[in-house]
Regions:
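N-proximal low-complexity "stem/linker" segments adjacent to membrane-targeting elements
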Residues: 47-56, 61, 79-131
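Short, acidic, metal-binding catalytic loop of nucleotide-sugar glycosyltransferases
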Residues: 130-141
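A conserved acidic beta->alpha catalytic loop
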Residues: 148-157, 180, 207
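Glycine-rich, basic loop-to-helix element that forms the pyrophosphate-binding segment
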Residues: 178-195, 216, 261-265
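Short aromatic/hydrophobic "clamp" motif used to bind/position activated sugar donors
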Residues: 200
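Conserved donor NDP-sugar-binding/catalytic core segment of glycosyltransferases
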Residues: 212-244, 321
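Short, flexible, basic/aromatic active-site loop/helix in glycosyltransferases
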Residues: 231, 247-267
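Active-site-adjacent helix/loop segment of glycosyltransferases
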Residues: 313-376, 411-493, 497-500, 506-510, ...
Length: 529
């Protein structure tokens, strides 16, 4: 059964609803069209523009999902087993063809051990624990394990007081104290070793859990293939400049889209500040490594290398109390970045990749070069008068960029002729332009993240390089400001972003010197996307 929503051609079907599907339901992703012709079916995605030939099973499922359907309804309509339908639908979701609603809760909620490592954060830890006492989750299915990593503040007395308080409730609070400081990774391992339940939830002591935190993440484990899941991390206090910046620009913020974590995908790890793991998987991997920084990245990479699966579900939200003084902000950024060298030593195959596909790279270089030339000549004309011929020459790279854009468009048109479907020129042109512009952002982000300080130093000796740096930063800051929607004006956002990049690059260099490993500064160049 399908509804009567059609566009132009009666053989072209697509979903017209934009709200999220209901829990346990699947629906055709917005911007996806199904074209039925001569007994075959094609799916057309607007962004990124692609045409995919469908096998009969996928075609039937997608057609049914023009209206919201559950796995049970799809299984009944297709005659397939429910588990096979669920697997197939999940694959279509990861490919961007279907959209899934929130998972249905399990018949009975599984028990969870929450592990919180802490060092000298008595006030923050108390706030964190009270948020856990208010979770919308059966208290009888929870145990909270605090690992005090040899704190010297009021942590001990505060925990004794809370232990007496929860003793009168149906809640479990266990405290384990290290006699000497051993680090956050080892502290997480200590807590997991003491855990009595099959699911271990890691939470940092300076975080506050939302009431529905576990209810949103735990249902993911109904899929036995999932070894770990993480949720969204937002800023606890967004009323400060750095707090509002960290809210959407922190390395802990993974976006608002449900994703599958993959070593080759856009999301390669989950922060351990908000992560649930099957205890048997933690045991198999021998826990977290004894690293001062980057232990969560290392754990995720080892988990993925073992063949296990990991998902990111942004609905499971916690709030992180970021350090909002400038010195602390810069030091933390540099410390995070310094882990890159250690991670490369442990995972030599996970090198940073710089994509340089010829067409996209030529387009980006032409646009950036053209803007650089015009900016430089405009500045010079202020002092030496207008130079028409020089401006005309500076416009040449922009003309070359336009020619490359047209070349890429007609190249796509030729590819589309292999399919029995006509896609209008404006759609293909727009998709090509969007892809080229996205690559220009990718290239600019790569250069500003790792080479801002270097370009600043070089610009003292070669001033035109400073114009290039301004253009690269302008591209990145402009795109990110629109994409992330931070709660601040663009001027303050630009300042925070520049300080962020400088601190990060300094941290990478410091880590390279510390570990005598320079590969983080030298990417692997690939010419194929």
């Amino acid at each position: 059964m399908v509804n009567d929503d059609t566009v132009e051609d009666s053989n072209v079907l697509m979903s017209t609803m934009h709200n999220k599907p209901r829990p346990g339901h699947y629906r055709l992703q917005e911007g996806v069209r199904i074209v039925s012709q001569d007994g075959s079916a094609l799916v057309v995605c607007d962004y990124p523009l692609r045409v995919v030939q469908l096998n009969p099973v996928a075609a039937q499922l997608l057609l049914l999902c023009i209206e919201e359907r559950t796995c049970g309804q799809l299984a009944q309509a297709t005659g397939m087993p429910v588990n096979r339908v669920e697997t197939f639908c999940d694959q279509l979701c990861w490919k961007g063809l279907l959209e899934a609603g929130p998972l249905l809760p399990p018949p009975t909620w599984p028990c969870v051990s929450i592990v919180i490592p802490s060092y000298n954060r008595a006030k923050e830890l108390e706030r964190c624990l009270y948020s856990l006492f208010s979770l919308d989750y059966p208290a009888s299915c929870l145990e909270i394990i605090v690992v005090d990593d040899a704190s010297t503040d009021e942590t001990g007395s505060m925990l004794q007081r809370l232990a007496q308080e929860v003793a009168t409730r149906d809640q479990e609070l266990h405290v384990i104290r290290h006699e000497q400081q051993r680090g956050v990774g080892i502290s997480r391992n200590t807590g997991a070793e003491a855990a009595q339940y099959g699911l271990v939830a890691y939470l940092d002591s300076d975080c506050v859990a939302s009431p529905g935190w576990l209810r949103e993440l735990v249902p993911t484990f109904q899929d036995t293939r999932i070894a770990a899941v993480g949720g969204m991390i937002r800023a606890y206090d967004r009323n400060t400049l750095l707090g509002s910046y960290e809210d959407v620009c922190s390395s802990l913020y993974m976006g608002e889209r449900t994703q599958q974590v993959s070593l080759k995908g856009p999301l390669t790890y989950l922060p351990s500040a908000n992560m649930l793991v099957r205890r048997m998987v933690w045991e198999k991997l021998a826990g977290f490594a004894a690293m001062t920084q980057g232990e969560d990245v290392d754990f995720c990479w080892r988990l993925l290398t073992s063949g296990a699966s990991m998902n990111y579900v942004p609905r499971g939200v916690i709030y992180h109390d970021y350090r909002t003084t400038l010195g602390a902000f810069l030091c933390i950024r540099a410390a995070y970045a310094s882990a890159e060298a250690a991670l490369i030593k442990h995972h030599p195959t996970e090198r940073r990749i710089l994509l340089l596909p010829p067409e996209q790279a030529f387009f980006a270089a032409s646009i950036i070069g053209g803007v650089w030339g015009i900016t430089r000549l405009t500045w010079q004309s202020i002092w030496s008068g207008f130079q028409g011929m020089a401006i005309a020459i500076a416009l040449l790279p922009l003309l070359l960029a336009l020619l490359m854009l047209l070349f890429g468009t007609f190249k796509r048109i030729q590819k589309m002729r292999n399919f029995p479907i006509a896609i209008e020129f404006p759609i293909i042109f727009k998709a090509t332009l969007r892809g080229y512009m996205a690559y220009m952002y990718h290239l600019s982000r790569h250069l500003t993240r790792y080479y801002t300080l270097l370009l600043l130093i070089v610009s003292f000796f070669l001033p035109p390089v400073f114009i290039l740096l301004l253009i690269l930063c302008g591209i990145v800051i402009g795109v990110d400001y629109v994409r992330l929607r931070p709660l601040m004006d663009i001027g303050r956002y630009a300042l925070c972003s520049l300080l962020d990049d400088c601190a990060y690059e300094a941290g990478v260099v410091w880590g390279c010197m510390k570990h005598r490993e320079w590969k983080p500064l030298v990417p692997i160049i690939k010419t194929k996307v």
